[in-house]
Amino acid sequence: MKSVLYSYILFLSCIIINGRDIAPHAPSNGKCKDNEYNRHNLCCLSCPPGTYASRLCDSKTNTNTQCTPCGSGTFTSRNNHLPACLSCNGRCDSNQVETRSCNTTHNRICECAPGYYCLLKGSSGCKACVSQTKCGIGYGVSGHTSTGDVVCSPCGLGTYSHTVSSADKCEPVPSNTFNYIDVEINLYPVNDTSCTRTTTTGLSESISTSELTITMNHKDCDPVFRDGYFSVLNKVATSGFFTGENRYQNISKVCTLNFEIKCNNKDSSSKQLTKTKNDDGIMPHSETVTLVGDCLSSVDIYILYSNTNTQDYETDTISYHVGNVLDVDSHMPGSCDIHKLITNSKPTRFL
């Protein structure tokens, strides 16, 4: 390294000395050489990259250009006769990466960091970087725009994406997987206060009214609780636990769902409910529904397991029922009849 630096200094010294010793000359055929510039109709030596012209050639004294090395934070990248070196660009922004550092022969270059694209290009890299579009769950990166932003496309049959990302593409569906678990709970309320619902989420998820609490626990599968919806549609209050349609479950394990319907009364007796519908066949799963006490409301639980990786959309449907089927036209509380609140959730498949 020292020998290289010494050679470079010696080279510059030679230029400075030669600049003094070699006199400017008249153009040949009206032109100067590539490493020269024309001043007062004389061809004078240019300074090489990394230096500047601290003194121009002088026809009166018959002396050539004097070149001086650039200082720290400055540069010249080509032959020149500039009166001073150029200042390097400042440090890169937080959303940029430095692809070339500042030295005496090159400017600093900043490019956009991963996850960003260039909105405004300059002669030395990008001047303004902005965040790339992030593809949501069920969508993957399929290309880029002319400016470098991400193009998102829905994952096709046999592919999936379960991330929110500006880099991930749709991936092939792993073998032995299914991807949709829908748990719908229909409540036929019997009093005004039972129209009100509260929810909790997590591994143990619950829906509560003034009369009962329904809790769902799950193991070896992931029926994610989305923004559930509560509505009075045809005088039926409906709540639901839903998965996203592109969340894949490993069917090498048995998906286990355990429900408890606990009535808010003094009756502590419990019993296991019997399935009213059972279409087992396409994937392993296990369910139990325990009723504690005796509720007045009618409760229907529907569980739908779907394999959306097949063209015909194979499904297993499990259902349970507890309570008396009410004459809702005669017994529906007045407040339930006018209470309508629907949030962003997937529509039910059963109503």
Swiss-Prot record:
Induction: Expressed in the early phase of the viral replicative cycle.
Residues of this chain annotated as glycosylated in UniProt: 103, 191, 250
InterPro entries for the chain: Poxvirus_TNF-rcpt-II_C, Poxvirus_TNF_rcpt-II, TNF_chemokine_rcpt-like, TNFR/NGFR_Cys_rich_reg, TNFRSF_N_viral
Function field: Inhibits host immune defense by binding to host TNF and various chemokines in the extracellular space. Binds host CC chemokines (beta chemokines) and CXC chemokines (alpha chemokines).
Gene designation per UniProt: OPG002
Cell membrane keyword on record: no
Protein name (record): Soluble TNF receptor II
Transmembrane residue ranges: none
